[in-house]
Amino acid sequence: MIQFTKMHGLGNDFMVVDGITQNVFFSPEQIRRLADRNFGVGFDQLLLVEPPYDPDLDFHYRIFNADGGEVENCGNGARCFARFVRNKGLTNKNKIRVSTSAGKMTLRLERDGTVTVNMGVPVLEPSQIPFKAKKAEKTYLLQTPQQTFLCGAASMGNPHCVLDVEDVANANVAEIGALLTKHERFPRGVNVGFMQVVNAGHIKLRVYERGAAETLACGTGACAAVVVGQIQGKLDQQVQVDLPGGSLTINWEGEGKPLWMTGPAQHVYDGQIQL
């Protein structure tokens, strides 16, 4: 039997598994089965806590999408990861350092129950996103057989494409997201953000996630949207990001600096399941 915890960050939900005190391995097929909301646990991502590879760090953090594929980063998951390792007694620290397949992150448990995550420095160089473009630009033209889109692009350890929309509530997220997430100019696929700028300190955002379709919240997507919005001269240093599942606060001092994301992490229940 595998012990697990169900958690969510703004409705972006996770199955969190302690891979330190129990020996676990998940095949892509097992993950797909567990992710099924009718026949399994049901989640957007599975989060796996592993021992650190680096003695200066506290944990290694792995993320698997509902389709079974491993991904580089998940901001909402990082907040739940921090709350989980603390609640389970795997650490007594308030400041937790972890590695992911994309790099290192610092997670900070706040007194009010929220978690602040150092999301790292955004990557804007196209080849590193990865995105096929000759050089970094504030906006790019993305052509499809149906229409041409204006977008910004950035990586937060995972690739993001951000579109400006006038009214996010009526944006065609499912259709356009499905069209762009596999666009040939993003060799590893891309998460697609639909951003409505309310004012310089406030945006509304919906995200079509690579491998998971639209989710209620996407932490890296919120960060990427703020980066693109700032670069395009539309946003301030601190921005409230309203997602369908709730709000995050993103702080970015500009190019070369890390982003800080603050938001909630909720425990739903503990369970056990036979693989």
Swiss-Prot record:
Pathway membership, UniProt: Amino-acid biosynthesis; L-lysine biosynthesis via DAP pathway; DL-2,6-diaminopimelate from LL-2,6-diaminopimelate: step 1/1
Q: Cellular component per GO?
A: cytosol
- Could you say which residues bind substrate here? 12, 45, 65, 75-76, 158, 191, 209-210, 219-220
Write the Enzyme Commission number(s) for this entry. Answer: 5.1.1.7
Keyword annotations of the record: Amino-acid biosynthesis, Cytoplasm, Isomerase, Lysine biosynthesis
**InterPro entries in UniProt:** DAP_epimerase_AS, DAP_epimerase_DapF
Annotated GO MF terms: diaminopimelate epimerase activity
Self-association and partners: Homodimer.
NCBIfam families xref list: DapF
Protein role: Catalyzes the stereoinversion of LL-2,6-diaminopimelate (L,L-DAP) to meso-diaminopimelate (meso-DAP), a precursor of L-lysine and an essential component of the bacterial peptidoglycan.
User: What is the protein named?
Assistant: Diaminopimelate epimerase
